[in-house]
Each structure stands twice: as structure tokens, then as C-alpha cells.
Amino acid sequence: DPKETWAFITWTMFAIYLHTRTNPNFQSANSAIVAFLGFIIIWICYFGVNLLGIGLHSYGSFNLH
């Protein structure tokens, strides 16, 4: 299911973000880049996956007719 896959990708990205924030070896710019990528992934998960219209949650897809 694409929504579950992209939700997993989102959770993974923000787990990476939390690890970059708590690890003193990484600079703050690295965590800002990861947070920005996580924000982009959230937009893909919210809008892009709904445009696919496949999977178990296809009732929540946009109609482009």
C-alpha cells in the first residue's frame, strides 16, 4: 500500500532527524537539511500519494476527472 510505505518513509526520516539533533558529531546544518527533506516527504505523502489512486486507501484519492 503506497500510503503505508510513505508513512514509514516519513517516520524513518524524522527518526534520522532526531538522531542528527542528539548526536554532537553532526552540525546543526545537517539536521536542518534532514528536517527540510522530511517536510518535502510529508508533502509527497499528503498530496502525491493521493494522486496515485491505488492501494487499499484509494477511496481517499483525488478525482481529476
UniProtKB/Swiss-Prot annotation:
Gene Ontology MF, one: heme binding
GO cellular component, one term: chloroplast thylakoid membrane
Keyword Protein biosynthesis: no
PANTHER family xref list: CYTOCHROME B_B6 PROTEIN-RELATED, HEME EXPORTER PROTEIN C
Family listed: Belongs to the CcmF/CycK/Ccl1/NrfE/CcsA family.
Location, primary (coarse class): plastid
Transmembrane spans: 5-19, 32-52
GO annotation (BP), single: cytochrome complex assembly
Cell location: Plastid, Chloroplast thylakoid membrane
Keyword RNA-binding assigned: no
Function according to Swiss-Prot or TrEMBL: Required during biogenesis of c-type cytochromes (cytochrome c6 and cytochrome f) at the step of heme attachment.
Oligomeric form and interacting partners: May interact with Ccs1.
A Pfam match: Cytochrom_C_asm
Protein name: Cytochrome c biogenesis protein CcsA
Topology relative to the membrane: Multi-pass membrane protein
Keywords recorded for this protein, A-Z: Chloroplast, Cytochrome c-type biogenesis, Membrane, Plastid, Thylakoid, Transmembrane, Transmembrane helix
